[in-house]
Amino acid sequence: METPPTPTTTTPPSLTTEGTMDDIQYLLHLEAMRRFQEDSRNVKRQVEEQVRIWLDAKCEYQRDFGRLARLLKCGALQAAVDAHRVSDVNQVDQAAKDIASLRSKLGSDLRPAILDSNDVKQCLEHLNTTHKPRLNLCRQQREFAQNQEALRSLRTAVDGLENGMEMGMIQAMDRLVEDLLPPRETNN
């Protein structure tokens, strides 16, 4: 049987206080750098997330604005069509009969010496009540000018809103970055 080796007592190498402090400071420095890099990555990730959210909101806003513009355009087009549309089929039939009657009278070889006063009165009445192209034109020009002014105002408002949203988002991101960054040490 072999005898086990006898244990020898070894004394640990002498540790100097200065070497230990340098090592601790170096480890603390490495830990601080690791935290700073981790915080930087975290801030960058959060900023990218906020930018993505902002871009999504901007796209949604532009899509909704486009829908609103198309809706306004369709409304204006419908108003223009309604202004030109004859409202009653009976009026169209009556106008066709009147035109046929006038055509037959004008197309005949017999020329009346005087016009029938009832026809003249009825024609004047129609001209005064239903056929007002100048009034319609003035009204349509006025509505067009109002629509143009409203469109300019809407464009100005949208530009202001976009600028305000952009500045607000930038300020919010700046505040978020300031909150996430480690506090700066000031030397006083």
From Swiss-Prot:
GO terms for biological process: cell division; mitotic spindle assembly; mitotic spindle organization; mitotic spindle-templated microtubule nucleation; regulation of mitotic nuclear division. GO terms for cellular component: cytoplasm; HAUS complex; microtubule; spindle. It is found in: Cytoplasm, Cytoskeleton, Spindle. Keywords: Cell cycle, Cell division, Coiled coil, Cytoplasm, Cytoskeleton, Microtubule, Mitosis. Component of the augmin complex composed of dgt2, dgt3, dgt4, dgt5, dgt6, msd1, msd5 and wac. The complex interacts directly or indirectly with microtubules and is required for centrosome-independent generation of spindle microtubules. As part of the augmin complex, plays a role in centrosome-independent generation of spindle microtubules. The complex is required for mitotic spindle assembly through its involvement in localizing gamma-tubulin to spindle microtubules. This is Augmin complex subunit dgt4.
